[in-house]
Amino acid sequence: MNRELIVNVTPTEISIAMCEDKVLVELNKEQCQTGFAVGDIYLGKVRKIMPGLNAAFVNIGHEKDAFIHYLDLGPQFPSLQKLVASQQPGKRGFRVESMKLEPPVEKTGKIGEYLQVGQQIMVQVAKEAISTKGPRLTADISLAGRNVVLVPFTSKVFLSQKIRSADEKKRLKRIAAAVLPKNFGVIIRTAAMEAKDEDIEHDIQTQIDRWRKTCAAIKKNAASAPAQLMSEMNRANTIIRDSLNGSFSQIAVDDEAMYNDIRGYIRQIEPEKEKIVKLYRGNVPIFDNFDISKQIKSLFAKYVSLRRG
């Protein structure tokens, strides 16, 4: 199967089309400069507790307050808050690996037991703002790489269900155990099956470094919260991270800044594939050139063709 990623950039929107053997199979659109993306991490301030909803509204700097439900605090919220408190001005601060973890959140508790108005909390955007609604948040923080997802405040190693080989499971668990500090766990993704030991080790260490930079940003921004602590990569790079494999033959981009961004990202995760990133300079719009526009239009026609009839 031959895969291509076609990226169209306009001043207001980024459109990303994934094609398999020239057939459009996935289309993603992302608004430019919205300021909030899924995966972004913030130091927010609790604005209002809603006991009836068992939820709270949190100010993260958006025009609309963000929403967090009790179940989205995550089991390790007390440990997370202990870390946030240690990073406040005048406090010495400490690392996750040196912490004694707090008892987990009860599954049937009340949000008022853990949050109060004015409290600073570390949160991650789980769902972007839609219409009049602000972003949806989680305090169950995780950092995704190509091969792994880092999960602080646990020592568990989880494997993708698609990894079935006993030998491969043993290899991946061995790699994780050798690299992970105390109180850090990982979810090992399907992509790790094709990865070398050193690539997985590097991915884990990269996510640990990102986490440490995020924690350092708490101390820097505690006096001026709400503040962004860590920004997730753009949507194009996220798709590449999650789906890049040997079947990709081309990534075509019609914007030079985005081209350089994607090329730089691939150089980090899979240098030998950097050459498949192409800057499109044609006079015809990129989606027209690759027959994307026509396929999108046909999806909204009265009759839609399906594979195998």
Where are these predicted regions, by residue range?
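DE-rich acidic low-complexity regions and acidic surface loops
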Residues: M1-G309
